[in-house]
């Protein structure tokens, strides 16, 4: 699975309340949530992301409360993948389960500049930035299957169909 796009960069400790503020959690429409993603840091993020972007961030991206809407809002806004030095474990699982690729890359914010154009091999974790190849951590075969299906629900529907035949 290859994903490519321009980079928007954030720092360390981007928590789920920054990704999607709590006041929007009562809404379930992904497109509505997308309009408010990253609002506390960049009120214009939704417009920038709508063209399809890769977020590059530092340590513990997605920390804080378990908020599935964070991954849903990012994906709906046009975020194709998140590359970070580390992820909060629950955000990592929520992202995969909602079809949003996440790649761990040591020193991510030092290795990749804002507005760079990157090409990511999600399976191997390799990231091409210009003529430089960075080695991130790939994902498991199961996680790749879930991503390729579009998320856990689509994966389960697919498996149910396969098992019926």
From Swiss-Prot:
The lineage of its organism: Archaea, Thermoproteota, Thermoprotei, Sulfolobales, Sulfolobaceae. Gene3D superfamilies: Aconitase, domain 4. GO terms for biological process: L-leucine biosynthetic process. It comes from the Archaea. Pathway: Amino-acid biosynthesis; L-leucine biosynthesis; L-leucine from 3-methyl-2-oxobutanoate: step 2/4. Its EC number is 4.2.1.33. It comes from Saccharolobus islandicus (strain Y.N.15.51 / Yellowstone #2) (Sulfolobus islandicus). Heterodimer of LeuC and LeuD. InterPro entries: Aconitase/3IPM_dehydase_swvl (IPR015928), AconitaseA/IPMdHydase_ssu_swvl (IPR000573), IPMI_Swivel (IPR033940), LeuD (IPR050075), LeuD_type2/HacB/DmdB (IPR011827). It catalyses: (2R,3S)-3-isopropylmalate = (2S)-2-isopropylmalate. This is 3-isopropylmalate dehydratase small subunit. Belongs to the LeuD family. LeuD type 2 subfamily. Catalyzes the isomerization between 2-isopropylmalate and 3-isopropylmalate, via the formation of 2-isopropylmaleate. Disulfide bonds: none annotated. One of its GO terms (molecular function) is 3-isopropylmalate dehydratase activity. CDD domains: IPMI_Swivel. Keywords: Amino-acid biosynthesis, Branched-chain amino acid biosynthesis, Leucine biosynthesis, Lyase.
């Amino acid at each position: 699975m290859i994903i490519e796009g321009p980079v928007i960069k954030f720092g360390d400790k981007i928590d789920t309340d920054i990704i999607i503020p709590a006041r929007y959690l009562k809404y379930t429409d992904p497109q509505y949530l997308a309009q408010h993603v990253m609002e506390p840091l960049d009120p214009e993020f939704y417009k920038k992301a709508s063209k399809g972007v890769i977020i590059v961030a530092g340590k513990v991206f997605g920390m804080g409360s378990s908020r599935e809407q964070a991954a849903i809002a990012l994906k709906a806004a046009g975020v194709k993948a998140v590359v970070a030095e580390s992820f909060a474990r629950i955000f990592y699982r929520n992202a995969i389960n909602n079809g949003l690729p996440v790649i761990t890359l040591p020193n991510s914010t030092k290795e990749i500049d804002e507005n760079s154009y990157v090409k990511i091999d999600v399976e191997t974790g390799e990231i091409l930035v210009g003529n430089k190849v960075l080695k991130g951590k790939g994902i498991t075969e199961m996680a790749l299957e879930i991503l390729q299906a579009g998320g856990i629900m689509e994966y389960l529907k697919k498996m149910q169909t396969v098992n019926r035949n």
